[in-house]
């Protein structure tokens, strides 16, 4: 079995109380088995972790934590070496820049929103021409605006929602 020891033996006895985590000191063979499994799969399933834990005589939650810590260490190493992390997008590409919307663009969009909370593609393209913003950003602006103003006046409720909200008969 792996040895469990206090996180820091140099702490006074009262600081090493029952709330302190124990660290896992694994044998070389346990470390080799953990590392071999990690090299095959950075995110093994619960069944794999349970099987590994049983095979090397370490509690499964400790195996889970070992994998989390190992992934964290690997990610830090990749960042230091500025290599892309497997499965992540290219760090040079990153996210799309945030679109800055001016006061006049906002005013125009608000007027359009008051007229129609669900503009069609033609109306959005016209707004795009008027504001100079891409149509896709106009669409997202309307989605966000509707989400912020949920429950306020908008489209008339559908027959289904009227039936669902009606008082019980009887």
Swiss-Prot record:
Highest taxon of the lineage = Eukaryota
Where mainly located?
Answer: nucleus
Extract the ranges annotated as region (Disordered): 75-100
Q: Which residues bind DNA?
A: 19-78, 94-153
Q: Which SUPFAM superfamilies match?
A: Homeodomain-like (SSF46689)
Q: Which SMART domains match?
A: HOX
Answer whether the UniProt record assigns the keyword Transcription to this protein.
yes
Keyword Glycoprotein in the entry? The reply is: no
| GO molecular function terms noted in the UniProt entry | DNA-binding transcription activator activity, RNA polymerase II-specific; DNA-binding transcription factor activity, RNA polymerase II-specific; RNA polymerase II transcription regulatory region sequence-specific DNA binding
Q: Which residues form the signal peptide?
A: none
Which of UniProt's keywords are assigned here?
A: Activator, DNA-binding, Homeobox, Nucleus, Repeat, Transcription, Transcription regulation
Q: Which Gene3D superfamilies match?
A: Homeodomain-like
User: Per the record, GO CC terms?
Assistant: nucleus
* Purpose: Probable transcription activator. Binds the P5 DNA element sequence 5'-GATCTGAGTCTAATTGAGAATTACTGTAC-3'.
Family that this chain belongs to: Belongs to the paired homeobox family.
Print the domain comment field.
Homeobox domain 2 confers nuclear targeting.
Q: What is this protein called?
A: Double homeobox protein 1
Q: Which organism is it from?
A: Homo sapiens (Human)
Lineage start = Eukaryota, Metazoa, Chordata, Craniata, Vertebrata
Encoding gene per record: DUX1
